[in-house]
Amino acid sequence: MTREEKSYIGFNEVEAKELLLSIGAEAFRYEQIQNWIFDNFVENWEEMENLPKDLIELLSNKIQLHPLQINLVSGSEYEPTQKFLFKTKSGHSIESVLMHEKKRTTVCISSQVGCAVDCKFCATASMGFIKNLNAYEIIDQVLHLERISKHKITNIVFMGMGEPFLNYKNVIKAAKFLNHKMGFGARRITISTAGIVPKIRKIAEEDHQFKLAISLNAVTEIERKKIMSLTNTHSLNELIKSAQYYYHKTRRLITFEYVLLKGINDSPLDAKRLISLLR
């Protein structure tokens, strides 16, 4: 992480405590600040009511609190779905979505700026790959939406911009933080992949409790290559074998995602092949 991308939320515990010590803050201020950020979801330093004004001023002048800034919101708070456009400290844009149903509120978060997978039906593919998000840029999407949501967030899905398994280290770090530090159950966190076979096997071996979703979208090698160029690297057969390996290793079910594309993958024969493929 470069100095330009640094924010307080991007600090680990040692770095945060060193910063506070350098400006003369008492040691207990660290826990107070953590509480404001991760339990009260404050937007800025000024909202931390039990911090002295001079400390707030020092922190405000020293470092930005959040690595992300909300630039645009689509949809009202009274609609079931809202889309948020964030700006990173490096000036790039990413999207998150807040979705509310009767008994659950889900956030869909991004893992990369752009995407290298090049799925023909995905708008992000036209951007190409720009950069990986660090773990705290991923986490900060949830923090912002926790503050904004009228309902408590219950589920998190890594289905926004980017291919999560091409940013594996930061995605797993963020997911573990959301689980251990922010209290989201591991089974309420879903990581979706277009089919990065080695990482499907890796996450099976590491035995994380997060849910896995695979974006399938076609039932033959030829059709999948047309709409998902990733198939040139990881064949459909390899993908299915890695999914079987994951299931036998973890005994956890996989969600298979299938976008219906008129005249491409939506025939009765496709449906029959899909049943046969996943049986």
State the predicted function of each range.
Residues 1-105:
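Flexible, acidic/Gly-rich N-terminal and inter-domain linker regions that tether
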Residues 76, 110-111, 192, 215:
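Short linear Ser/Thr-Pro motifs
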Residues 88, 113-115, 216-218:
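Short, small-residue-rich loop/turn micro-motifs
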Residues 100-137:
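Canonical Radical SAM [4Fe-4S] cluster-binding loop centered on the CxxxCxxC motif
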Residues 125-155:
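Conserved alpha-helical substructure of the radical SAM core
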Residues 146-155, 160-279:
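Conserved AdoMet/S-adenosylmethionine-binding subsite of the radical SAM
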